UniProtKB/Swiss-Prot annotation:
Domain of life: Bacteria
Protein name in UniProt: Dihydrofolate reductase
GO CC term, one of those recorded: cytosol
CDD domains in alphabetical order: DHFR
Annotated family: Belongs to the dihydrofolate reductase family.
Catalytic activity: (6S)-5,6,7,8-tetrahydrofolate + NADP(+) = 7,8-dihydrofolate + NADPH + H(+)
Keywords: NADP, One-carbon metabolism, Oxidoreductase
Gene Ontology BP terms: dihydrofolate metabolic process; folic acid metabolic process; one-carbon metabolic process; tetrahydrofolate biosynthetic process
Pathway(s) annotated for this protein in UniProt: Cofactor biosynthesis; tetrahydrofolate biosynthesis; 5,6,7,8-tetrahydrofolate from 7,8-dihydrofolate: step 1/1
InterPro entries assigned: DHFR (IPR012259), DHFR-like_dom_sf (IPR024072), DHFR_dom (IPR001796)
């Protein structure tokens, strides 16, 4: 399944200067537990925001046409959109950002996992998602955020 996962403010903010403007350990723990032992795909800017360090205990794939897979294969690089969709038919693949990648894959997503912070933060990049094509299946409530789980209506 193709799953998009992100965290946003109440008004859809997702970053400031290519960084998260918040640190909420409980939300990071949720992200880690959800994506652990799976393939994650991110854009080059998201990878750069992580100081080009792959995330532990996950297969890191960078969606880019200008990067190459390093010799040590600490991460992989692709720009094959169709291959990502084909692979997602066989296993869970998480798109973790950034916004351009979310925009590209949103229409093909089987599942959206959206953490919504219970506060506003200063952001310069915002998610604008039309949830009309998705069903809200479940919510997990935490002290500082709510996780909304959506499924694509076309999948039902």
């Amino acid at each position: 399944m193709l799953k998009l996962i992100w965290c946003q403010t109440l008004n859809g903010g997702i970053s400031k200067n290519n960084k998260l403007p918040w640190y909420i350990k409980e939300e990071l723990d949720h992200f880690y537990k959800t994506t652990k032992n799976h393939k994650i795909i991110m854009g080059k800017n998201t990878f750069d925001s992580l100081d080009q360090k792959p995330l532990n205990n996950r297969t890191n794939i960078i969606f880019s046409s200008i990067m190459q897979t390093p010799e040590d294969e600490s991460y992989f690089v692709t720009n094959d959109f169709q291959q990502v969709l084909n692979d997602a038919k066989k296993e869970d693949i998480f798109i973790i950002g950034g916004k351009e990648l979310f925009d590209i894959f949103l229409a093909y997503a089987d599942v959206l996992i959206v953490s919504v912070l219970k506060d506003y933060y200063d952001c310069d990049l915002y998610m604008k998602v039309d949830y009309n094509n998705f069903n809200l299946d479940k919510q997990d409530v935490y002290d500082n955020f709510i996780v909304n789980y959506y499924s694509n209506k076309k999948e039902k």
